[in-house]
């Protein structure tokens, strides 16, 4: 039978304080700083709204990381916090202990509450003070407003959740008294008229990461384009499932693509660009690449249709010479010359760490073109080549060229064509024999950290199975 540790005197005193309906600001003025976080959590979870209002006004830290607490269904408590902030923003004389400058609603703040909770349990507050997370400021608005509100916007439903609705309404009514700072914006499904009203409330200069994944057609993209051009500190842009409407003529398509790509001329901080299933890139990649103003660290173009001329323009783009990540998976290259890809790999050989060429349809006759350049990518730590129908001989040749890449930690290759029957079914006994042969040859050449071989996609579930050189079971 376990024996529960009795509550410490400080805990008992704090709980008694919360039960006091006549809690006064003068009482909080004398409350030890270390009691504020655990008591605030207690008040929030128990919906002690009047106590919350006063505790916000007397908060002894510059930052209030509220996001972990609003995961609890406590809209009433959340509103009480906003009411407390109202008092701070509108009253002329602030409480003596008032330090609050940042209301942090980003999804990265749980450590603050964990540290202070453990300190309360152990009675060791000195370590908690040492482990405080540094306040994240917004340099753009420093000194202009008394309060900055950090928020991450995930627009994933037709309507906003009740917390975000409550917050944005509150911000809208007090826009001259605070600064709303959004660094991460995800649009996963919402009518654009709703998105527009939210973007008008946010300082677009603050946004550093944008992800759009909601099957937009080009006419909708044109409505978003002007906002993109104002995100001058944008570092990461992810676009997925952008389609060309059948009602858009080739002339209209060219005009829309031009409007969109010219916005990149204003993005002087962009480092990561990812585009998945973006159909308007075909024949227009040069327009986008010519508007890039920075050297990219990450470039992902996946499951798109590109012309051979697009690949040529990519290999000639000056903004890709310092890439660390290159992902071209799902780009069909079967009937193309891979000389542009060879030139591209030569350009990024000094910096490239991650290369994904899955499902590009690369065949035996094409592989030799990229081998010399690939073998000079000495910083490469991950290489994936799954889904390309190559023979055993070509696979062995490929492995012999990657042998000198000493930083290579993870390698993924397709099961060679000899592993399959004429109807495309994997022959397990033959595959096991091939793996044994490959294991011997690879061990003779080097000691790889991890090599996996993958089968073709299952016609029933659509998934692949992965096997290492020795295991008989799947390594998924």
From Swiss-Prot:
A Gene Ontology biological process in which this protein takes part is: positive regulation of cell population proliferation
Keywords of this entry: Leucine-rich repeat, Repeat, Ubl conjugation pathway
| Pathway where this protein functions | Protein modification; protein ubiquitination
Does the record's keyword annotation contain Iron-sulfur?
no
Describe its partners and assembly state. Answer: Component of a CRL2 E3 ubiquitin-protein ligase complex, also named ECS (Elongin BC-CUL2/5-SOCS-box protein) complex, composed of CUL2, Elongin BC (ELOB and ELOC), RBX1 and substrate-specific adapter PRAMEF6.
Q: What gene codes for this chain? A: PRAMEF6
Q: Which family does it belong to?
A: Belongs to the PRAME family.
- Name of the molecule in the record: PRAME family member 6
Source organism lineage? Eukaryota, Metazoa, Chordata, Craniata, Vertebrata
């Amino acid at each position: 039978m376990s024996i529960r540790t009795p509550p410490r005197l400080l805990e008992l005193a704090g709980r008694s304080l919360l039960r006091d309906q006549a809690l006064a600001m003068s009482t909080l003025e004398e409350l030890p700083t270390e009691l504020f976080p655990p008591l605030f959590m207690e008040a929030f979870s128990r919906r002690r709204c009047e106590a919350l209002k006063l505790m916000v006004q007397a908060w002894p830290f510059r930052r209030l990381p509220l996001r972990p607490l609003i995961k609890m269904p406590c809209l009433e408590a959340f509103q009480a916090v906003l009411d407390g902030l109202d008092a701070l923003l509108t009253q002329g004389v602030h409480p003596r202990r008032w330090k609050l400058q940042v209301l942090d609603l980003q999804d990265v703040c749980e450590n603050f509450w964990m540290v202070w909770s453990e300190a309360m349990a152990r009675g060791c507050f000195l370590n908690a003070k040492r482990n405080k997370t540094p306040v994240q400021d917004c340099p753009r608005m420093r000194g202009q407003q008394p309060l900055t509100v950090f928020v991450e916007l995930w627009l994933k439903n037709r309507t906003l959740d009740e917390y975000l609705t409550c917050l944005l309404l509150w911000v809208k009514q007090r826009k001259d008294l605070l600064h709303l700072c959004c660094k991460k914006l995800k649009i996963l499904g919402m009518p654009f008229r709703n998105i527009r009203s939210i973007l008008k409330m946010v300082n677009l200069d603050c946004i550093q990461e944008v992800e759009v994944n909601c099957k937009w057609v080009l006419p909708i993209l044109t409505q978003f384009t002007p906002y993109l051009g104002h995100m001058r500190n944008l570092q990461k842009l992810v676009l997925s499932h952008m389609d060309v409407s059948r009602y858009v003529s080739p002339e209209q398509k060219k005009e829309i693509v031009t409007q969109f790509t010219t916005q990149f001329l204003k993005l002087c901080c962009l480092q990561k660009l990812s585009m998945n299933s973006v159909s308007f890139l075909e024949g227009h990649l040069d327009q986008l690449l010519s508007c890039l103003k920075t050297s990219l660290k990450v470039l992902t173009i996946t499951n798109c249709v590109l012309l051979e001329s697009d690949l040529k323009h990519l290999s000639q783009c000056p903004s890709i010479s310092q890439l660390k990540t290159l992902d071209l998976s799902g780009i069909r290259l079967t009937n193309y010359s891979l000389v542009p890809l060879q030139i591209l790999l030569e350009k990024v050989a000094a910096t490239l760490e991650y290369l994904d060429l899955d499902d590009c349809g690369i065949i035996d006759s094409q592989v030799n073109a990229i081998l010399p350049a690939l073998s000079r990518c000495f910083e490469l730590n991950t290489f994936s080549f799954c889904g390309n129908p190559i023979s055993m001989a070509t696979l062995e040749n490929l492995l012999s060229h990657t042998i000198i890449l000493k930083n290579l930690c993870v390698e993924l290759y397709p099961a060679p064509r000899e592993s399959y029957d004429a109807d495309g079914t994997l022959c397990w006994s033959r595959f096991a024999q091939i793996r044994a042969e490959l294991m011997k040859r690879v061990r003779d050449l080097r000691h790889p950290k991890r090599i996996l071989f993958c089968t073709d996609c299952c016609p029933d579930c659509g998934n692949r199975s992965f096997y290492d050189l020795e295991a008989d079971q799947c390594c998924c």
